[in-house]
């Protein structure tokens, strides 16, 4: 466990954030405590409420959403040689914590032979996904039988509630909890005199191990930026701001959006729709990803946001940075 003493300084007006406590309670329970200061009266609550909502509702997670076995007649049946009922096995699969960046649906498998215990370690996963806690229990095989279950893995946010209908192919949907943050709280400490009252925001984050609290904080912050960036763009367009007076602020806080907007403006006089991506010296893997998503010209590319690009199969955040670097040289 790492813990730092919180020092309140009234001599500086520079706003700073800091991790003051960090610990790992178990493989599936991480804790982090952060502070942000100094803030004016009322700002801590504004930031704390928004951040808590983003942490609990906006972050994506990876879960098992379906299990399939042709030998299972229905969800509430029992199988000879297995201690748990099918329903109990499904509930155990629901609790498995996964870590990974994937888009769309991926398949995984469990193939085990009894007698013995089946744990998360027995799940055969795609390369982009890994188990957080290999010891999580799935089933107990009491006889020398083979247990083979096909699994479906998805990445999403919030809750995934299964539809109440019968599946006759041995496929059973699993209610998924995609949220990597288990809980988040904020509190406020006030200091200073009545004339210059200031606040410190304390933010506590508990995660399931698929993200650290610091990673969750960064991701929630980026999601909030993505939500609010549209208002800044609208202000730029409607008021016709001159001389790029907000360039420094935008470049520091919103690097991707800033560079993309500047890049589009810079190339307005160029017939972007006639410049094809195969002229841009992109690496073969990135080029193939773009082509599969029907992105053929620079105009097609600039009309996609970072989120659009990240939804493409096998696309990474490093690829976005590489694309921007190549386009800025054009």
UniProtKB/Swiss-Prot annotation:
InterPro entries: DNA-dir_RNA_pol_insert, DNA-dir_RNA_pol_RpoA/D/Rpb3, DNA-dir_RpoA, RBP11-like, RNAP_asu_C, RNApol_insert_sf
Chain segments annotated as transmembrane: none
Region Alpha N-terminal domain (alpha-NTD), residue ranges: 1-235
Predominant location: plastid
Cellular component, GO annotation: chloroplast; DNA-directed RNA polymerase complex; mitochondrion
GO molecular function term, any single one: DNA-directed RNA polymerase activity
Functional description taken from the UniProt entry: DNA-dependent RNA polymerase catalyzes the transcription of DNA into RNA using the four ribonucleoside triphosphates as substrates.
Keywords on record: Chloroplast, DNA-directed RNA polymerase, Nucleotidyltransferase, Plastid, Transcription, Transferase
Tree of life domain: Eukaryota
Name assigned to this protein: DNA-directed RNA polymerase subunit alpha
Region: Alpha C-terminal domain (alpha-CTD), residue numbers: 270-330
Gene3D superfamilies xrefs: 5' to 3' exonuclease, C-terminal subdomain, DNA-directed RNA polymerase, insert domain, RNA polymerase, RBP11-like subunit
Species this protein is from: Gossypium barbadense
A Pfam family recorded for this sequence: RNA_pol_A_bac
């Amino acid at each position: 466990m790492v813990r730092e003493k919180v020092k309140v300084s009234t001599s500086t007006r520079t706003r700073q954030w800091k991790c003051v406590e960090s610990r790992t309670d178990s493989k599936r329970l991480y804790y982090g405590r952060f502070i942000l200061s100094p803030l004016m009266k009322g700002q801590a609550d504004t930031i704390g409420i928004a951040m808590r909502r983003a942490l609990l509702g906006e972050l994506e997670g990876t879960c098992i959403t379906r299990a399939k076995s042709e030998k299972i007649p229905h969800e509430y049946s029992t199988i000879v040689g297995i201690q748990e009922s099918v329903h109990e096995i499904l509930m155990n699969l629901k609790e498995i914590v996964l870590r990974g960046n994937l888009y769309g649906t991926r398949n995984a498998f469990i193939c085990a032979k009894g007698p013995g215990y089946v744990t998360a370690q027995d799940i055969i996963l795609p390369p982009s996904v890994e188990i957080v806690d290999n010891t999580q229990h799935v089933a107990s095989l009491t006889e020398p039988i083979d247990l083979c279950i096909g699994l479906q893995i998805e990445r999403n946010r919030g809750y995934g509630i299964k539809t109440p209908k019968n599946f006759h192919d041995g496929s059973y949907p699993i209610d998924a909890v995609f949220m990597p943050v288990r809980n988040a709280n904020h509190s406020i400490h006030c200091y200073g005199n009545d004339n210059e009252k200031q606040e410190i925001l304390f933010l506590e984050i508990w995660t399931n191990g698929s993200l650290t609290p610091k990673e969750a904080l960064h991701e929630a912050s980026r999601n909030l930026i993505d939500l609010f960036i549209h208002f800044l763009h609208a202000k730029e367009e409607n008021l016709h701001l001159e001389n790029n007076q907000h360039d420094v602020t935008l470049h520091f806080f919103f690097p991707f959006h800033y560079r993309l907007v500047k890049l589009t403006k810079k190339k307005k006089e160029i017939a972007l729709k006639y410049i094809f991506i195969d002229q841009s010296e992109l690496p073969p893997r990135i080029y193939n990803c773009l082509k599969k998503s029907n992105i053929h010209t620079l105009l097609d590319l600039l009309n996609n946001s970072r989120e659009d690009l990240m939804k493409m199969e096998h696309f990474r955040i490093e690829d976005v940075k590489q694309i921007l670097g190549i386009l800025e040289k054009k």
